Design a protein with these regions (language model features):
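Conserved beta-strand hairpin/beta-sheet module of binuclear metal-dependent hydrolase folds
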Residues: 1-52, 146-158
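Active-site neighborhood of phospho(di)ester-bond hydrolases with catalytic His/Asp-centered motifs
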Residues: 37-40, 58-66, 84-88, 136-139, ...
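Active-site environment of divalent metal-dependent phosphoester hydrolases
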Residues: 44, 65-71, 91-94, 142-144, ...
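Active-site HxH/HxHxD metal-binding segment of metal-dependent hydrolases
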Residues: 46-126, 213
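Divalent-metal (often Zn2+) His-rich catalytic cores of metallo-beta-lactamase-fold enzymes
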Residues: 79, 85, 177-232
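Core dinuclear metal-dependent hydrolase active-site scaffold
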Residues: 122-149
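Metal-dependent phosphodiesterase/nuclease catalytic metal-binding core
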Residues: 146-164, 172-191, 198
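C-terminal regulatory/interaction regions
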Residues: 225-274
Length: 274
């Protein structure tokens, strides 16, 4: 399934794999001038290609290598001769996606992308008249970048934002590194966030501040309860509840307990959150 909308100069593509009428997970891609930011899932590839008819796609920027962000790279590179850019640490897995062993749910929802030739992105780029800073952000994946347009105060966050209140952590994520990256991003003047999961988030600076506040408070509560002698599984039950469908559907890849354990194991957690 694919839906198209616009926001100022942007065309936004919301897509996901259709299982009958059910779409288990949507992602967003953003076209500005001739540049596409992320390419979504290959399961929506034919619809995406049709939606892009009559548009120029000379360049693709991948925020990171995950399969729901690179799924149509190869097809668009073949169709439009688009050059693809990403952080150097993402390039090996974009060019050779089977370097990464996908979980069963990932294969079902997104599938393996085809490999695509990719170039290292610099610190800055222009998309038409729009200047962008390229900002590396740790915590979600190796080689993740965000894109910031200072005149419009736009921030393209890939998977660094994904809503204010998150109660799960992927087993390849780092809670404290995500928090540090978000704190760095919060120093920017932000009007609008463009999020792979949530789409357009107006009042983006406030939303980012709320997310940081939530994460810091959650971390503080986790550490406080643990220092009082509460076992980690009891901390989870009190603050986040027991594991639910997300845990079982993803085979434990998304986990409340892993969030708790990750906070407790981090060297950053040896000091009190201000």
């Amino acid at each position: 399934m694919l839906k198209t909308s616009t926001y100022e100069d942007l065309t936004i593509y919301k897509m996901g794999r259709s299982i009958g009428k059910f779409v288990p997970y949507f992602v967003h891609c953003f076209l500005l001038e001739d540049t596409l930011i992320d390419t979504g899932t290959g399961f929506a590839g034919s619809e995406f290609l049709s939606a892009l008819q009559g548009k120029k796609v000379n360049r693709i920027v991948n925020t990171h290598y995950h399969e729901d962000h690179t799924g149509n790279n190869y097809m668009l590179q073949q169709k439009h001769a688009a050059r693809i850019f990403a952080h150097r640490d993402s390039i090996p897995n974009i060019e050779n996606p089977r370097n990464v062993k996908l979980k069963l749910y990932q294969k079902w929802i997104w599938g393996y992308p085809e490999g695509s030739a990719t170039e290292a992105i610099g610190d800055h780029l222009y998309i038409g008249s729009h200047p962008f800073r390229v900002i590396p952000c740790d915590g979600h994946s190796a080689g993740h970048i965000c894109l910031y347009e200072p005149h419009k105060k736009w921030l393209f966050t890939g998977d660094m934002f994904c809503g204010i209140r998150n109660i799960y952590l992927r087993r390849d994520e780092d809670f404290n590194q995500i928090l540090l990256s978000l704190e760095d991003l919060s120093k920017l003047k932000i009007d609008t966030i463009f999020c792979s999961l949530k789409g357009v988030v107006t009042g983006g600076g406030n939303a980012l501040s709320e997310k940081i506040k939530y994460m810091k408070n959650l971390k503080k509560e986790i550490l406080s309860l643990h220092r009082q002698g509460m076992p980690a599984d009891k901390v989870r039950n009190k603050l986040l509840g027991k594991e639910d469908m997300m845990f079982y559907v993803t085979g434990g890849h998304f986990s409340k307990q892993y969030l708790i354990n990750n906070v407790l194991a981090s060297p950053y957690s040896k000091s009190t959150v201000e």
